């Protein structure tokens, strides 16, 4: 069996041991990306990838291919419909980095409301010690208490973000095609997209990239 690993440094910056795959056959790793993906996976039985794009035309050149593993949650890099037509299963990692990504969303929110990086840089360059005022006040902090967060996509990551937002005293408006009544409470409710956009102080996008969600937030 031949196993091909595309995007190798991205999938494994160094802490993952891939040697166990050697037990199953020949393992080929690529550390750069090329347009002609089929030239690298044409004789593969199994393919691991992250950002490399694989089209149906590529898959049609892979007569031995039996399985594709996308080492990420999003799988828009693979023509899934084309793979299905050719009988090639495609797997992803549905709960990859859920807590970390939700935490990162809140970190970005706090940066916007408190300008932490800016003030840190100002203190490091000595402004605090050299300023004659009691404090420098370039930006007013924005308190999250009683603000409204709109969350588009209340899946695993959206739920983490919602939970932390509510802990800050925020109200949550959620828009999702699949509604879970168990997530509704006095501080969190589902609504339509127009209502969410009109009533939110901040909006978090936690939906997968599909044709129907692409450019969901636009100038209009």
Where would I find each of the regions flagged by the language model?
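Phosphate-binding beta-alpha-beta segment of Rossmann-like dinucleotide-binding domains, i.e.
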Residues: 86, 94-148
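N-terminal Rossmann-fold NAD(P) dinucleotide-binding loop
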Residues: 158-159
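Short beta->alpha connector loops at strand-helix junctions that form conserved
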Residues: 31, 71-72, 88-99, 194
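Rossmann-fold NAD(P)-binding glycine/threonine-rich loop
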Residues: 76-88
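N-terminal glycine-/charge-rich "phosphate-binding" loop or analogous flexible N-terminal tail
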Residues: 1-44, 173
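Glycine-rich Rossmann-fold phosphate-binding loop(s) that bind the pyrophosphate
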Residues: 154-155
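Rossmann-like adenosine-cofactor binding region
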Residues: 54-59, 173, 177-220
């Amino acid at each position: 069996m031949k196993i091909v690993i595309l995007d190798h440094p991205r999938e494994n910056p160094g802490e993952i041991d891939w040697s166990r795959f050697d037990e199953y056959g020949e393992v080929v790793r690529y550390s750069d990306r090329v347009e002609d993906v089929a030239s690298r996976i044409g004789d593969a039985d199994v393919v691991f990838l992250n950002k490399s794009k694989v089209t149906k035309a590529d898959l049609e050149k892979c007569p031995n291919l039996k399985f594709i593993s996308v080492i990420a949650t999003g799988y828009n890099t693979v023509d899934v419909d084309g793979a299905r037509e050719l009988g090639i299963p495609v797997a992803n990692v549905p709960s990859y980095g859920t807590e970390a990504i939700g935490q990162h969303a809140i970190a970005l929110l706090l940066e916007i409301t408190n300008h932490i990086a800016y003030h840190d840089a100002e203190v490091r360059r000595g402004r605090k010690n050299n300023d004659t005022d009691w404090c420098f006040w370039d930006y007013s902090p924005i308190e999250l208490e009683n603000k409204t967060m709109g969350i588009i996509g209340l899946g695993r990551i959206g739920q983490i973000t919602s939970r932390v937002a509510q802990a800050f005293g925020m109200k949550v408006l959620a828009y999702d095609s699949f509604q879970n009544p168990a997530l509704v409470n006095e501080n969190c409710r589902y609504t339509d997209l127009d209502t969410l956009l009109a009533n939110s102080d901040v909006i978090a996008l936690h939906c997968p990239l599909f044709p129907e969600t692409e450019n969901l937030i636009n100038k209009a």
